[in-house]
Amino acid sequence: MPIPPELALTSEQLDELMLTSWNMRIASMGPGTRINLTPLWFGWAGGNIYTYCRGQKIANLRRNPVATVLVDRNERFPELQGAMFQGRAVVLEDSDAEAADPNMEAVRTQMGSKYAGGHGESAEPRRNESTARGRHWRWVRFEPSRVVTWDNKKIKPRG
């Protein structure tokens, strides 16, 4: 059953969710038929989701770029807000691919500010300088083709 449009996040609410939430979860297809679900730090720019990761996630996305990303917040049902993105992941294989991405500089600055201080405020936000290295450390740009959002705070009480 689809989520009624009146319960969806506005574009401003979606941006706020994506810019302030700490983790996303990405589901990719592992070897065979197993789904690999992993929490990761992320950036949001140009309607795309960016993350820097390694290992099985990169191997999975190279093999099959179809993935789903979930970003949500709050624990109690009446307060749940979130967004599910279905789409395709693009592994940025080298520094040239990173430099060619029009959002990469904004994402590096955003993620540096967001995560530089761990779970507290960073004394001095710094840019995320991570780049492709070795066989599996890569930036990934997730390009959504379908977005579903919800804001349970908008559900009217029965009665």
Give short role names for the model-derived ranges:
Residues 2-25:
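Short, basic/aromatic recognition patches
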Residues 18-19, 59-63, 133:
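Alpha-helix boundary recognition
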Residues 14-15, 58, 108:
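Short amphipathic alpha-helical segments and helix-helix/interface helices
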Residues 41-43, 62, 141:
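Well-ordered beta-strand positions
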Residues 1-9, 78-159:
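Charged, gly/pro-rich active-site loop segments
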Residues 57-90:
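Helix-adjacent hinge/juxtasegments
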Residues 21-54, 69-72, 81:
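Short beta-strand segments
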Residues 54-57, 111-112:
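Short, solvent-exposed aromatic-acidic interface loops
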